[in-house]
Swiss-Prot record:
Enzyme class: transferase
Binding sites annotated in the UniProt record for AMP: T31, R36, Q57, L58, V59, G85, F86, P87, R88, Q92, R156, R167
UniProt name for this protein: Adenylate kinase
Main location: cytoplasm
GO biological process, one term: AMP salvage
CDD domains: ADK (cd01428)
Catalytic activity: AMP + ATP = 2 ADP
GO cellular component, one term: cytoplasm
Disulfide bond residue pairs: none
Cross-referenced Gene3D superfamilies: P-loop containing nucleotide triphosphate hydrolases (3.40.50.300)
Binding positions (ATP): G10, A11, G12, K13, G14, T15, R123, T132, Y133, K200
Superkingdom classification of source: Bacteria
Length: 214
């Protein structure tokens, strides 16, 4: 079962990725993790990537696709894998296709921008412990204070409204066209496209996914 997850930052992809991995016993392939592992291992692609990163450049699609090809050839991917955060652009999706990587399911989590902003902007964090709260969905016992230590909670830079809206802008310009791309692929019978309402309760979304993949 080879799966690609699509959805804006804050749409709940990470939570559902965890569910899919555990339920179906397939690994999640994160391009960031792959890059770090290849650089640490000193592989040929890792050396190329390190040189590019050290020069302050973006790693090319060619290197990323090469890393994916190596990763999915490993034994733990025999039953399938989950791609999260890749492809982000049409050329990357074309690259996967040209490599002969068949995708069984493309899963999109649909959440309106304003809902995502509310979700992210309402987050509060206790940085020393990593504990997180939400002013609406998971509030601390005392407003603005960590439940365990009583220390102040903060809004991480990543969760500030202007940062969230900027990231959403990048998503809509770069990644949203993939929705149309994979819609066409599904119409041609090359993959199955599944769309879920990401505003539902986490357990309900998981149940909907399980039913659709059965």
């Amino acid at each position: 079962m080879r799966i690609i997850l699509l959805g804006a930052p804050g749409a709940g992809k990470g939570t559902q990725a965890q569910f899919i991995m555990e339920k179906y016993g397939i690994p999640q392939i994160s391009t960031g993790d792959m890059l770090r592992a290849a650089i640490k291992a000193g592989t040929e692609l890792g050396k190329q990537a390190k040189a590019v990163i050290d020069a302050g450049q973006l790693v090319s699609d060619e290197i990323i696709l090469g890393l994916i090809k190596e990763r999915i050839a490993q034994e733990d991917c025999a039953k399938g894998f989950l791609l999260d955060g890749f492809p982000r652009t049409i050329p990357q999706a074309d690259g996967l296709k040209e490599m002969g990587v068949a995708v069984d399911y493309v899963i999109e989590f649909d959440v309106a921008d304003d809902v995502i902003v509310e979700r992210m902007a309402g987050r509060r964090a206790h940085l020393p412990s990593g504990r997180t709260y939400h002013v609406v969905y998971n509030p601390p016992k005392v407003e603005g204070k960590d439940d365990v230590t009583g220390e102040d909670l903060v809004v991480r830079d990543d969760d500030k409204e202007e940062t969230v809206r900027a990231r959403l802008g990048v998503y809509h310009s770069q990644t949203a066209p993939l929705i149309e791309y994979y819609g066409k692929e599904a119409a041609e019978g090359n993959t199955k496209y599944l769309k879920f309402d990401g505003t539902k309760q986490v357990a309900q979304v998981s149940a909907d996914i399980e039913k659709a993949l059965a």
